[in-house]
Every structure is written in structure tokens, then in C-alpha cells.
A protein has these predicted regions:
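A short acidic, leucine-rich amphipathic alpha-helix
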Residues: 42-48, 61
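Short coil turns linking two alpha-helices in DNA-binding domains
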Residues: 50-55
Length: 187
């Protein structure tokens, strides 16, 4: 049995950030958060994927210390490993500034924003056949002059939105939506 997991894991190594680059790995962590602990087969069912497509990614997340083995249980005649995320929340250490870390973080942001672009594009094209417009689609880009307190308040609101979305995520009983947000201090 794995020891009690911490509430927050602060990622501070480039290899950990690189492990998050693919949307599938982000989806795996989100599903693990929803399921608390799951076998590869259970994760595959939750994600609508073949189990074989997940093993490599779970191994990479485990090697980066973002996922850990919780227990091994019997499933018929086979032993089945049950995994869990390494912490309730995984956060990136924003104070880390080594070149390798910043490069890995840049790649992660590019991959995340590219995935968001693919999701919005797919949503737009899915509605181009004459159906009613998708009133849930929303895109906002703002630049503003903010105080440090304003930025902290905005981050707190985004944290609250992320918590709300995570708490209301239920596999199988609602439509799927994508949310992406970024706050960046402009040079």
C-alpha cells in the first residue's frame, strides 16, 4: 500500500514538465484525479481508449514521479496494478528558472495551446453543418496593467474555476468541454 499522498506536489524538474507535454498524459492525470485510483483497464474505459495505448504514458508519468503504484490486486487470474496520482494537485514551481526548466515549460505551454486550438477548431467544424450555433464556445484574450494583488486575485479565481470544473466532471453523464487559460506577464 502506498503512503498517504500529499495534497500538492510542486514540479521542479524539467523531466517532470516534459512528462506532461502530451494531452493524453494530462488526460490520464485528470482521470486519475476523478477516479482517485485506477488500473490501466479502468483508465482506458474512462478515457475511451484501448488499454495498450496507455501503458507507455503511465510508465513515463510514473518515472517522472507524477503517478505511483497504489496496490496490486487480482483480476481473474492476473495481477493488476492500480495507480494513483502522486498528489491531489500537481503544480509547477513558478520560481524555477534554469534554462532546461524554462525550455521544458515552454514546450508544455506550446503543446497545451496547440491542443486547445485543435479542440476549438473541431468544435467549430462540428457545428458548420447548419446546426444551431454552439453557445458554449467562448474565446477571450485580454492584456491589462495589473497590480501584484490583482494578479493574485485572478490566479485565485482561475484556481476556483479549475476546482469547480474538476468537482463537476462526471464521466458519462454530460457533454465534454475543454477549458484552457493562461496568465503571462508581458515583457
Amino acid at each position: 500500500m502506498a503512503p498517504r499522498k500529499p495534497r500538492i506536489l510542486h514540479i521542479s524538474e524539467p523531466r517532470q514538465v516534459r512528462a506532461l507535454r502530451t494531452p493524453l498524459r494530462q488526460d490520464i492525470l485528470q482521470a486519475m484525479s476523478l477516479l482517485e485510483a485506477a488500473s490501466v483497464k479502468e483508465l482506458a474505459t474512462a478515457l475511451g481508449r484501448a488499454p495498450a495505448s496507455l501503458y507507455y504514458h503511465i510508465h513515463e508519468l510514473e518515472n517522472a514521479g507524477l503517478v505511483r503504484k497504489r496496490t496490486v490486486r487480482r483480476s481473474g487470474t492476473k495481477a493488476e496494478t492500480v495507480y494513483e496520482s502522486a498528489a491531489e494537485q500537481i503544480r509547477i514551481d513558478r520560481a524555477k528558472r534554469t534554462k532546461g526548466f524554462v525550455d521544458a515549460l515552454t514546450d508544455l505551454h506550446k503543446a497545451t495551446l496547440s491542443q486547445a486550438t485543435r479542440e476549438v477548431t473541431a468544435a467549430l467544424h462540428a457545428r458548420s453543418g447548419g446546426d444551431a450555433p454552439d453557445n458554449s464556445l467562448m474565446l477571450v484574450r485580454l492584456s491589462a496593467r495589473l497590480s501584484g494583488a490583482d494578479v493574485k486575485a485572478a490566479r485565485r479565481m482561475l484556481d476556483e474555476l479549475a476546482a469547480f470544473i474538476s468537482e463537476h466532471d462526471r464521466v458519462g453523464n454530460r457533454e465534454a468541454f475543454s477549458f484552457t487559460a493562461a496568465i503571462a506577464k508581458l515583457p
